[in-house]
Amino acid sequence: MRNIIKLALAGLLSVSTFAVAAESSPEALRIGYQKGSIGMVLAKSHQLLEKRYPESKISWVEFPAGPQMLEALNVGSIDLGSTGDIPPIFAQAAGADLVYVGVEPPKPKAEVILVAENSPIKTVADLKGHKVAFQKGSSSHNLLLRALRQAGLKFTDIQPTYLTPADARAAFQQGNVDAWAIWDPYYSAALLQGGVRVLKDGTDLNQTGSFYLAARPYAEKNGAFIQGVLATFSEADALTRSQREQSIALLAKTMGLPAPVIASYLDHRPPTTIKPVNAEVAALQQQTADLFYENRLVPKKVDIRQRIWQPTQLEGKQL
Protein backbone atom coordinates (compact mmCIF):
# COMPACT_ATOMS: atom_id res chain seq x y z
CA MET A 1 0.00 0.00 0.00
CA ARG A 2 2.84 2.42 0.80
CA ASN A 3 4.28 1.85 -2.67
CA ILE A 4 0.91 2.63 -4.24
CA ILE A 5 0.70 5.90 -2.33
CA LYS A 6 4.26 6.81 -3.27
CA LEU A 7 3.51 6.18 -6.93
CA ALA A 8 0.37 8.29 -6.71
CA LEU A 9 2.30 11.15 -5.14
CA ALA A 10 5.02 10.89 -7.75
CA GLY A 11 2.40 11.13 -10.45
CA LEU A 12 0.88 14.18 -8.83
CA LEU A 13 4.18 15.98 -8.80
CA SER A 14 4.60 15.43 -12.53
CA VAL A 15 1.20 16.82 -13.59
CA SER A 16 0.04 20.42 -13.57
CA THR A 17 -3.55 21.63 -13.71
CA PHE A 18 -2.38 25.17 -14.43
CA ALA A 19 -0.58 25.81 -17.72
CA VAL A 20 2.70 26.40 -15.94
CA ALA A 21 5.64 27.94 -17.72
CA ALA A 22 9.23 27.31 -16.71
CA GLU A 23 9.39 28.06 -13.00
CA SER A 24 12.13 29.88 -11.14
CA SER A 25 11.73 29.23 -7.44
CA PRO A 26 11.98 32.06 -4.90
CA GLU A 27 14.06 31.79 -1.78
CA ALA A 28 10.99 31.28 0.41
CA LEU A 29 7.22 30.85 0.45
CA ARG A 30 5.18 31.47 3.61
CA ILE A 31 1.73 29.90 3.34
CA GLY A 32 -1.30 30.72 5.45
CA TYR A 33 -3.87 27.93 5.73
CA GLN A 34 -6.92 26.94 7.75
CA LYS A 35 -7.91 23.66 9.33
CA GLY A 36 -10.42 23.08 6.56
CA SER A 37 -8.04 23.76 3.66
CA ILE A 38 -7.91 20.14 2.49
CA GLY A 39 -5.59 20.58 -0.50
CA MET A 40 -3.16 22.66 1.53
CA VAL A 41 -3.22 20.34 4.53
CA LEU A 42 -2.54 17.28 2.36
CA ALA A 43 0.19 19.07 0.43
CA LYS A 44 1.79 20.02 3.75
CA SER A 45 1.45 16.52 5.19
CA HIS A 46 2.97 14.87 2.11
CA GLN A 47 5.57 17.66 1.75
CA LEU A 48 4.64 17.98 -1.92
CA LEU A 49 5.88 21.56 -2.24
CA GLU A 50 9.06 20.80 -0.35
CA LYS A 51 9.75 17.95 -2.79
CA ARG A 52 8.83 19.96 -5.87
CA TYR A 53 10.78 23.06 -4.82
CA PRO A 54 13.70 21.83 -2.69
CA GLU A 55 15.57 25.10 -3.22
CA SER A 56 12.75 27.14 -1.62
CA LYS A 57 12.10 27.31 2.11
CA ILE A 58 8.41 26.45 2.53
CA SER A 59 6.79 27.47 5.82
CA TRP A 60 3.20 26.99 6.97
CA VAL A 61 1.13 29.10 9.38
CA GLU A 62 -2.33 27.99 10.55
CA PHE A 63 -5.09 30.56 11.10
CA PRO A 64 -8.55 30.15 12.68
CA ALA A 65 -10.29 32.01 9.84
CA GLY A 66 -9.76 34.08 6.70
CA PRO A 67 -9.85 37.60 8.21
CA GLN A 68 -6.93 36.87 10.53
CA MET A 69 -5.01 35.29 7.66
CA LEU A 70 -5.39 38.28 5.38
CA GLU A 71 -4.34 40.62 8.18
CA ALA A 72 -1.10 38.63 8.28
CA LEU A 73 -0.83 38.82 4.49
CA ASN A 74 -1.29 42.58 4.60
CA VAL A 75 1.49 43.14 7.15
CA GLY A 76 3.88 40.86 5.29
CA SER A 77 3.87 37.86 7.64
CA ILE A 78 2.81 35.43 4.88
CA ASP A 79 2.98 35.43 1.07
CA LEU A 80 0.02 33.28 0.05
CA GLY A 81 -3.23 32.14 1.63
CA SER A 82 -6.67 30.70 0.97
CA THR A 83 -9.98 32.05 2.29
CA GLY A 84 -13.65 32.16 1.53
CA ASP A 85 -15.17 34.87 -0.64
CA ILE A 86 -15.66 37.64 1.94
CA PRO A 87 -12.27 38.14 3.67
CA PRO A 88 -10.58 39.59 0.56
CA ILE A 89 -13.41 42.10 0.14
CA PHE A 90 -12.92 43.37 3.70
CA ALA A 91 -9.15 43.36 3.21
CA GLN A 92 -9.38 45.35 -0.02
CA ALA A 93 -11.70 47.87 1.63
CA ALA A 94 -9.07 48.27 4.35
CA GLY A 95 -6.39 48.98 1.75
CA ALA A 96 -4.53 45.66 1.76
CA ASP A 97 -2.25 45.24 -1.27
CA LEU A 98 -3.33 41.72 -2.18
CA VAL A 99 -4.38 40.04 -5.41
CA TYR A 100 -6.64 37.13 -6.30
CA VAL A 101 -4.46 34.42 -7.86
CA GLY A 102 -6.87 31.47 -8.02
CA VAL A 103 -10.39 30.25 -7.25
CA GLU A 104 -12.10 26.98 -6.34
CA PRO A 105 -15.76 26.43 -7.25
CA PRO A 106 -18.20 26.85 -4.34
CA LYS A 107 -18.98 23.85 -2.16
CA PRO A 108 -22.50 24.71 -0.95
CA LYS A 109 -22.89 21.61 1.22
CA ALA A 110 -19.82 22.48 3.31
CA GLU A 111 -21.23 25.67 4.84
CA VAL A 112 -24.42 25.93 6.86
CA ILE A 113 -26.59 27.73 9.38
CA LEU A 114 -27.14 25.47 12.38
CA VAL A 115 -29.80 25.56 15.08
CA ALA A 116 -30.41 23.30 18.06
CA GLU A 117 -32.31 20.14 17.22
CA ASN A 118 -35.25 21.18 19.42
CA SER A 119 -35.18 24.84 18.37
CA PRO A 120 -38.50 26.47 17.45
CA ILE A 121 -36.67 28.08 14.50
CA LYS A 122 -37.81 26.12 11.45
CA THR A 123 -36.97 28.44 8.55
CA VAL A 124 -34.48 31.22 7.86
CA ALA A 125 -37.36 33.70 8.19
CA ASP A 126 -37.72 32.56 11.80
CA LEU A 127 -34.28 34.00 12.58
CA LYS A 128 -35.83 37.45 12.84
CA GLY A 129 -34.99 38.96 16.22
CA HIS A 130 -32.66 36.09 17.17
CA LYS A 131 -28.95 35.95 17.93
CA VAL A 132 -26.81 34.40 15.20
CA ALA A 133 -23.12 33.68 15.78
CA PHE A 134 -20.52 33.80 13.01
CA GLN A 135 -17.04 35.04 12.17
CA LYS A 136 -17.30 38.62 10.94
CA GLY A 137 -15.93 39.09 7.44
CA SER A 138 -15.93 35.35 6.68
CA SER A 139 -17.68 33.31 4.01
CA SER A 140 -20.30 32.42 6.63
CA HIS A 141 -21.07 36.12 6.89
CA ASN A 142 -21.94 35.99 3.19
CA LEU A 143 -23.91 32.75 3.57
CA LEU A 144 -26.02 34.34 6.29
CA LEU A 145 -26.58 37.62 4.45
CA ARG A 146 -27.63 35.84 1.26
CA ALA A 147 -29.90 33.42 3.13
CA LEU A 148 -31.59 36.32 4.93
CA ARG A 149 -32.13 38.17 1.66
CA GLN A 150 -33.59 35.04 0.06
CA ALA A 151 -36.01 34.77 2.99
CA GLY A 152 -37.09 38.40 2.68
CA LEU A 153 -35.16 39.63 5.72
CA LYS A 154 -32.56 42.34 6.17
CA PHE A 155 -29.32 41.93 8.08
CA THR A 156 -30.69 44.35 10.67
CA ASP A 157 -33.56 41.94 11.35
CA ILE A 158 -31.25 39.65 13.33
CA GLN A 159 -28.88 40.14 16.25
CA PRO A 160 -25.42 39.38 14.81
CA THR A 161 -22.93 37.97 17.29
CA TYR A 162 -19.39 38.17 15.95
CA LEU A 163 -17.30 35.27 17.26
CA THR A 164 -14.43 33.10 16.08
CA PRO A 165 -15.41 29.52 15.19
CA ALA A 166 -14.23 28.13 18.54
CA ASP A 167 -16.00 30.81 20.58
CA ALA A 168 -19.12 30.56 18.43
CA ARG A 169 -19.29 26.82 18.99
CA ALA A 170 -19.09 27.30 22.76
CA ALA A 171 -21.77 30.00 22.72
CA PHE A 172 -24.01 27.81 20.56
CA GLN A 173 -23.59 24.75 22.77
CA GLN A 174 -24.33 26.80 25.89
CA GLY A 175 -27.47 28.26 24.36
CA ASN A 176 -26.16 31.82 24.40
CA VAL A 177 -26.98 32.22 20.69
CA ASP A 178 -29.89 30.85 18.70
CA ALA A 179 -28.09 29.90 15.49
CA TRP A 180 -24.58 29.46 14.18
CA ALA A 181 -23.35 30.10 10.63
CA ILE A 182 -20.23 28.02 10.08
CA TRP A 183 -18.15 26.07 7.59
CA ASP A 184 -16.51 22.65 7.63
CA PRO A 185 -14.91 20.88 9.41
CA TYR A 186 -16.56 22.71 12.33
CA TYR A 187 -19.95 21.91 10.80
CA SER A 188 -19.25 18.18 10.52
CA ALA A 189 -17.88 18.08 14.07
CA ALA A 190 -21.06 19.68 15.42
CA LEU A 191 -23.26 17.44 13.27
CA LEU A 192 -21.66 14.23 14.49
CA GLN A 193 -21.70 15.40 18.09
CA GLY A 194 -25.47 15.58 17.77
CA GLY A 195 -28.18 17.88 19.01
CA VAL A 196 -28.07 20.16 15.96
CA ARG A 197 -30.15 20.67 12.85
CA VAL A 198 -29.20 22.23 9.52
CA LEU A 199 -31.44 25.22 8.91
CA LYS A 200 -29.88 26.18 5.58
CA ASP A 201 -26.80 25.34 3.54
CA GLY A 202 -25.27 27.22 0.63
CA THR A 203 -27.41 25.60 -2.06
CA ASP A 204 -29.03 28.16 -4.39
CA LEU A 205 -27.29 31.11 -2.74
CA ASN A 206 -24.96 31.82 -5.67
CA GLN A 207 -21.74 32.11 -3.67
CA THR A 208 -18.43 32.59 -5.44
CA GLY A 209 -16.21 29.91 -3.94
CA SER A 210 -12.86 29.92 -2.18
CA PHE A 211 -10.04 32.19 -3.27
CA TYR A 212 -6.28 32.04 -3.18
CA LEU A 213 -4.71 35.40 -2.38
CA ALA A 214 -1.13 36.62 -2.57
CA ALA A 215 0.72 39.79 -1.73
CA ARG A 216 0.83 41.76 -4.98
CA PRO A 217 4.64 42.22 -5.09
CA TYR A 218 5.15 38.50 -4.46
CA ALA A 219 2.70 37.49 -7.21
CA GLU A 220 4.20 39.89 -9.74
CA LYS A 221 7.69 38.59 -9.06
CA ASN A 222 6.85 34.87 -8.87
CA GLY A 223 4.00 34.29 -11.31
CA ALA A 224 4.98 30.92 -12.76
CA PHE A 225 5.98 29.66 -9.33
CA ILE A 226 2.55 30.53 -7.90
CA GLN A 227 0.86 28.66 -10.76
CA GLY A 228 2.90 25.60 -9.88
CA VAL A 229 2.03 25.90 -6.20
CA LEU A 230 -1.69 26.14 -6.92
CA ALA A 231 -1.49 23.18 -9.28
CA THR A 232 0.14 21.18 -6.49
CA PHE A 233 -2.71 22.05 -4.12
CA SER A 234 -5.23 20.81 -6.69
CA GLU A 235 -3.29 17.60 -7.15
CA ALA A 236 -3.16 17.06 -3.39
CA ASP A 237 -6.91 17.65 -3.13
CA ALA A 238 -7.49 14.91 -5.72
CA LEU A 239 -6.01 12.40 -3.26
CA THR A 240 -9.26 12.60 -1.28
CA ARG A 241 -10.86 10.69 -4.14
CA SER A 242 -8.04 8.41 -5.31
CA GLN A 243 -6.75 7.64 -1.80
CA ARG A 244 -9.84 8.37 0.31
CA GLU A 245 -9.25 6.15 3.34
CA GLN A 246 -5.56 7.02 3.58
CA SER A 247 -6.42 10.71 3.25
CA ILE A 248 -9.05 10.46 5.99
CA ALA A 249 -6.56 8.84 8.36
CA LEU A 250 -3.90 11.43 7.58
CA LEU A 251 -6.26 14.40 7.87
CA ALA A 252 -7.69 13.08 11.14
CA LYS A 253 -4.19 12.94 12.57
CA THR A 254 -3.01 16.31 11.30
CA MET A 255 -6.25 18.16 12.11
CA GLY A 256 -6.75 16.48 15.47
CA LEU A 257 -10.30 15.45 14.55
CA PRO A 258 -12.05 12.05 14.58
CA ALA A 259 -12.02 10.15 11.29
CA PRO A 260 -15.85 10.24 10.99
CA VAL A 261 -15.71 14.06 11.08
CA ILE A 262 -13.19 14.08 8.24
CA ALA A 263 -15.25 11.58 6.24
CA SER A 264 -18.34 13.75 6.65
CA TYR A 265 -16.38 16.82 5.59
CA LEU A 266 -15.11 15.09 2.44
CA ASP A 267 -18.66 14.04 1.61
CA HIS A 268 -19.68 17.71 1.73
CA ARG A 269 -16.95 18.92 -0.61
CA PRO A 270 -15.87 16.93 -3.69
CA PRO A 271 -12.31 17.67 -4.85
CA THR A 272 -12.03 20.48 -7.37
CA THR A 273 -9.34 22.17 -9.42
CA ILE A 274 -7.98 25.63 -8.66
CA LYS A 275 -8.37 27.88 -11.68
CA PRO A 276 -7.46 31.46 -12.61
CA VAL A 277 -10.08 34.07 -11.73
CA ASN A 278 -11.94 34.82 -14.98
CA ALA A 279 -14.33 37.64 -15.82
CA GLU A 280 -17.40 35.67 -14.75
CA VAL A 281 -16.00 34.91 -11.30
CA ALA A 282 -14.81 38.49 -10.89
CA ALA A 283 -18.29 39.79 -11.75
CA LEU A 284 -19.91 37.48 -9.19
CA GLN A 285 -17.42 38.54 -6.53
CA GLN A 286 -18.17 42.18 -7.41
CA GLN A 287 -21.87 41.49 -6.81
CA THR A 288 -20.99 40.14 -3.38
CA ALA A 289 -18.86 43.18 -2.58
CA ASP A 290 -21.69 45.48 -3.66
CA LEU A 291 -24.16 43.52 -1.50
CA PHE A 292 -22.00 44.04 1.57
CA TYR A 293 -21.59 47.73 0.79
CA GLU A 294 -25.33 48.19 0.35
CA ASN A 295 -25.83 46.64 3.79
CA ARG A 296 -23.17 48.96 5.26
CA LEU A 297 -20.98 46.03 6.21
CA VAL A 298 -17.90 47.42 4.44
CA PRO A 299 -16.98 51.12 4.66
CA LYS A 300 -16.57 51.79 0.95
CA LYS A 301 -17.11 50.33 -2.50
CA VAL A 302 -14.32 48.21 -3.92
CA ASP A 303 -13.44 47.36 -7.51
CA ILE A 304 -12.62 43.66 -7.60
CA ARG A 305 -11.10 43.88 -11.08
CA GLN A 306 -8.26 45.99 -9.69
CA ARG A 307 -7.12 43.02 -7.62
CA ILE A 308 -7.31 40.18 -10.14
CA TRP A 309 -3.94 38.72 -11.06
CA GLN A 310 -3.86 36.89 -14.39
CA PRO A 311 -1.06 34.49 -15.33
CA THR A 312 0.02 35.65 -18.78
CA GLN A 313 0.98 32.09 -19.76
CA LEU A 314 -2.65 30.95 -19.72
CA GLU A 315 -4.95 31.07 -22.69
CA GLY A 316 -8.62 31.91 -22.50
CA LYS A 317 -10.75 34.86 -21.58
CA GLN A 318 -8.82 37.50 -19.70
CA LEU A 319 -10.11 40.45 -17.73
Swiss-Prot record:
Protein name: Putative aliphatic sulfonates-binding protein
Gene3D superfamilies: Periplasmic binding protein-like II
Pfam families in the cross-refs: NMT1
Protein family per UniProt: Belongs to the bacterial solute-binding protein SsuA/TauA family.
Sections of the chain in a coiled coil: none
Annotated localization: Periplasm
Entry-linked InterPro entries: ABC_SsuA_sub-bd, Solute-binding_3/MltF_N, SsuA/THI5
GO terms for MF: ABC-type alkanesulfonate transporter transporter activity
Recorded GO CC terms: ATP-binding cassette (ABC) transporter complex, substrate-binding subunit-containing; membrane; periplasmic space
Organism of this sequence: Escherichia coli (strain K12)
Any one Gene Ontology BP term: alkanesulfonate transmembrane transport
